[in-house]
Amino acid sequence: LNVLVSLEGVLSSDNSDNPNRAGALLYYALKAGHRVAIFTSWTQEQAEHWLLVNGFVGYDELIDNRYDLIGDELSKRQITVARSRQAVEMVVTAEPSLAAWSFENGIPALLFAHPDTMGIANRPDVPSKMRPWGSIEDVITKRNIKRSQ
């Protein structure tokens, strides 16, 4: 398989420069039998240094932030660029929206949900967000109609 693995949130923590041990385990399990490319929002120099210092070696490709275009989400653009080079058969990410986008675009996605590194906005145990005002108005309207009948 050709696998794309996100550096942020999978290999590294979102809130520190420390490597994620579970992410390292997953990386080396995938690397044992598959082609693994790493994508990141960092520069090539920053990413190569971090990967070397933290023992992530043997990756097949590094897709850095040079593919950023105004108006496009960088990670989606990176996946599109990777797909233009060869088949991408799996995306590993800690971002639920990117996993959903990958799935919608025909790429199997593995959502790496680690409680210590997943962004707070994406955690399933965070209290639900406030409802949009339009949704509240709809509920009030339906309730008023029901009461008037």
What are these regions (language model features)?
Residues 86-128:
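Acidic, Mg2+-coordinating phosphoryl-transfer loop and its flanking beta/alpha structural elements
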Residues 25, 47, 78-79, 98:
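Residues within well-ordered alpha-helices
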